[in-house]
Amino acid sequence: MPIETEPNRTRKNFEPKRFGGSLFILFTLLLFLNLFVLRGPRFPITAYSDFITQVEAGQVERVEVRPDRIRYILKSDQYGFNEGTETAAVFDTVPVGIDLELPKFLREHDVQYFAPPPSSLSWLPTLLGWVVPPLIFFGIWSWLINRNQGAGPAALTVGQSKARIYSEGSTGVTFDDVAGVEEAKTELLEIVDFLAHADKYTRLGAKIPKGVLLVGPPGTGKTLLAKAIAGEAKVPFFSISGSEFIELFVGIGAARVRDLFEQAKQQAPCIVFIDELDALGKARGGPGGFTGGNDEREQTLNQLLSEMDGFDPNVGVILLAATNRPEVLDPALLRPGRFDRQIVVDRPDKMGREAILKVHVRGVKLAEDINLTKLAVRTPGFSGADLANLVNEAALLAARQSRDAVVMSDFNEAIERVVAGLEKKSRVLNDLEKKTVAYHEVGHAIVGSLMPGAGTVEKISVIPRGIGALGYTLQLPEEDRFLITASELRGRIATLLGGRSAEELIFGVVSTGASDDIQKATDLAERYVTLYGMSDELGPIAYEKAQQQFLEGVPNPRRTVGPQVVEAIDQAVKDVVDGAHHMALSILSINQDMLQLTASHLLEKEVLESQELHSLLSQPQFPPDMDEWLQTGKLPQGKELIQTTLNSHQLIGIN
């Protein structure tokens, strides 16, 4: 995206390199003048004792006494010169201290002596001694602070805003380039309409929001929406990241905030966009924030609060910000009068994903078999950035195969690349490892096909992918889901344990290949108990504090509880996992023929999908106690867990 201009301010035409070169030339001339012009001719220097000896011997004809030295001329006959010749022996000597007896000594030996008249340039060496050192210091300092600067001294620009300014419509993005977030677009269109027709609102006494905060997971299009607003509104657009306010020097952040708003007022109507606001606006003294009254971030935040609450709401300056961590922002920043409106930009649903795909495939040559609706169904949970990457990956795969257009198989492979990682055909498994992986993946597929809300098993593969996956099972939901019931959570845990259960049932031992499944199953069971309150023993009590609303993978802190409660939580989690493990073993036991047949086909072809896979998994049998377990989470009274009756496990490793 082209940058129209840097911070909009008038600067002097200051060229540090030219200035430094001129200073160097001036210094060289002064040094040459002092060393060669002002000092005059040079003569041999003798010892002061030799000078005294020569005077006593009557060899000295004339002496010139200077403040710092004595210059004397020997008699011509001492060197064999004839009288009247212009050649004479001239020497310099430096006296030892101040010799007050020297005039008397010279008179006694009939030696002429005199002091030279003051020179008209005698002041120049003194002046150079005072002027040249400061000039040298200033020149070095000027060069150091300007060597990395394109214009102006850094000391004079460090407090200026680093915001990039885009002229009217120069972002190159409009609302036609944004899809899948229709509700957010509708809200932001009001901002655009205000900038274009402000009188429509002010004549009724309405006030446009001073600030609009875009919140949502990463990659959902928050920054893209901000660019679209600037492109649609045809007004100057200031863009800066929250981290660009803070620098090494104290007070720079607050100065840059002041400078940013001064520029914005001069360019009004305009939009000021601060990306990653959480880098600047963390709660003061709160969780994830900063402490200390002199903290640079706190000073910068205070200045931002002052500027947002201080400028006239109808001058046409609208502050737009984006963050994926709204829970850590300072409450004073979110109050009405500052960020009046908060717009959630969430992951798109099926229709939104299809609309986003239509935007991103505009410049891509597509084959006739491409069905964007099917692609939208196969990409649940994908953000706008994920879908853009998906289209690009599919185009790259088609180019790698030298195709004239992108076909549906390219998109299917691209989805698997995004979800499971790259294929690693060079990783060769031995027969035992390959057989173990095959039964492991088929175990996932059979158990998952019977669980409620789990979706359809689309593909099973024993080709290694990604960092550590030796195989994978692709199971896609039939629709977008926003709520999950307790029975569906239990079914997901059982599906995760289906791979390990198949290994136990067929081989009598388990491998390390199930470690990731166990980790995910345990995490889900712990949330089942501590966050969702679905345990009958502990009741609807949340033992974890949900903090990260839009960022995944960040653990929630547990509340302070007593040791008895901790023990009860651990037991409840174990009961959930044990019940799911028992149900997975029960399902695979009564469907062992299906497990054997499907695994043999998978070992032969390495990949099973489409109709062939559906026919193999078409009629699985249900354990008699599965419905009761899914509904209540309890097994029949006195029912013994299947895993307790199996042989003791022997740990083997699969690399």
Swiss-Prot record:
Cofactor(s), names only, from the UniProt record: Zn(2+)
UniProt entry keywords in alphabetical sequence: ATP-binding, Hydrolase, Membrane, Metal-binding, Metalloprotease, Nucleotide-binding, Plasmid, Protease, Thylakoid, Transmembrane, Transmembrane helix, Zinc
Binding site for Zn(2+): 440, 444, 517
Main localization category: membrane
Lumenal side: 39-124
E.C. numbers: 3.4.24.-
Active site: 441
GO terms, biological process: protein catabolic process; proteolysis
Localization, UniProt: Cellular thylakoid membrane
TM region positions: 18-38, 125-145
A cellular component term, taken from the record's GO annotations: plasma membrane-derived thylakoid membrane
Cofactor info, note text: Binds 1 zinc ion per subunit.
Bilayer topology term: Multi-pass membrane protein
UniProt family annotation: In the central section; belongs to the AAA ATPase family. In the C-terminal section; belongs to the peptidase M41 family.
NCBIfam families: FtsH_fam
Assembly with partners or alone: Homohexamer.
Summary of the function given for this chain in its UniProt record: Acts as a processive, ATP-dependent zinc metallopeptidase for both cytoplasmic and membrane proteins. Plays a role in the quality control of integral membrane proteins.
Name of this protein: ATP-dependent zinc metalloprotease FtsH
Species for this entry: Acaryochloris marina (strain MBIC 11017)
Gene that produces this protein: ftsH
